[in-house]
């Protein structure tokens, strides 16, 4: 019986805050008409953009006949549309569902698995914090389990059942597949990329989680055994770490990263992942330390894969003409 509520409340609050935070710390062809459009202003200055070179020349004769000299006959500003530039960047970052994608998963697994060989001092410090947090929850595991049991109700069970689904691959993978199709048929490169990286993160994180489960062989809370019951090197018991939590955090991290410009995406993504992790404790499927390590594993695995894909897409250049009352020229943007 859980007698002292202080450790339980502290541990639950700490766990929730951590996983809500998500842990401690090829360009396609664009036609000119697709890239340029008329607008009333840009983030830099008010003005107008142009649809193509012809309309640009016809609008007050900006170019002479041989196109070698640029002359200003209007005080208005002409620039490419920010919205079109964003579309171009998304196209440059496109990830295709092809043979290279599948081959890349295997190389990414090898790179991620050997990441500790390339860690610097800050990485090792982060790993130490995670190990310390896992150890802390390991000490409090049984008290936290008892605290959840004492506060359990049919309403909480219903909420837990709802959020458990987000960590179920039979549901999350088809959902990601549907999101990819939405991006593919809707010509939304960001949606395609997000879905494909999320699927890869799910698979890679799931593999690492399975290896750890088999290595630890920890008994689940539902068995009635103590939190210190580890058989080691067995598939009979797979409590440590939580697979639902690790994979849902892997997906949430990708979505939050790819849609970081949308304010509500990050809190919703990590909020759902947090509730999924807590549902596993409520349902006595996992100890709190299982959930804590699972969240960290999913988060940092996805961060590593996102960096890999960022490197793979290369350093792209965006070039567009710009003319204003002070002169004209070519704007060259480099994406790192």
PLM region spans:
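Bacterial N-terminal signal peptides
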Residues: 11-22
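Perimembrane loop-to-helix junctions flanking transmembrane segments
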Residues: 149-159
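Alpha-helical transmembrane segments of multi-pass membrane proteins
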Residues: 133-143
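Hydrophobic cores of alpha-helical transmembrane segments in multi-pass inner/ER membrane proteins
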Residues: 173-179
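Alpha-helical transmembrane segments
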Residues: 127-131
């Amino acid at each position: 019986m859980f007698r002292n509520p202080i450790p339980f409340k502290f541990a639950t609050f700490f766990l929730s805050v951590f996983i809500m935070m998500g842990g401690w710390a090829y360009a396609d062809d664009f036609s000119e008409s697709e890239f340029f459009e008329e607008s009333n202003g840009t983030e830099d200055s008010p003005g107008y953009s142009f649809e193509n070179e012809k309309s640009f020349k016809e609008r007050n004769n900006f170019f002479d006949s041989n196109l070698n000299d640029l002359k200003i006959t209007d005080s208005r500003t002409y620039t490419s549309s920010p919205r079109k530039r964003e579309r171009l960047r998304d196209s440059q970052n496109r990830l295709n569902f092809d043979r290279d994608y599948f081959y890349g998963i295997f190389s990414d697994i090898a790179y991620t698995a050997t990441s500790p060989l390339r860690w610097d001092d800050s990485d090792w410090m982060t790993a130490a914090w995670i190990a310390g947090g896992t150890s802390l929850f390991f000490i409090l595991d049984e008290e936290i389990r008892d605290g959840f049991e004492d506060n359990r109700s049919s309403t909480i069970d219903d909420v837990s059942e709802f959020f458990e689904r987000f960590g179920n691959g039979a549901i999350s993978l088809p959902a990601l597949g549907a999101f990819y199709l939405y991006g593919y048929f809707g010509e939304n490169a960001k949606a395609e990329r997000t879905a494909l990286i999320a699927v890869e993160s799910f698979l890679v994180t799931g593999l690492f989680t399975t290896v750890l489960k088999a290595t630890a062989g920890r008994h689940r809370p539902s068995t009635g055994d103590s939190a210190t019951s580890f058989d080691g090197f067995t598939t009979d018991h797979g409590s440590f770490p939580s697979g639902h939590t690790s994979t849902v955090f892997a997906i949430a991290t990708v979505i939050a990263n790819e849609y970081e410009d949308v304010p509500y995406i990050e809190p919703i993504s990590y909020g759902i992942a947090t509730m999924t992790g807590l549902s596993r404790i409520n349902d006595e499927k996992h100890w709190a330390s299982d959930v804590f390590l699972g969240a960290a594993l999913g988060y940092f695995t996805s961060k590593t894969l996102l960096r890999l894909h960022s490197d793979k897409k290369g350093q792209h250049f965006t070039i567009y003409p710009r003319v204003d009352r002070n002169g004209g020229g070519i704007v060259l943007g480099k994406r790192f």
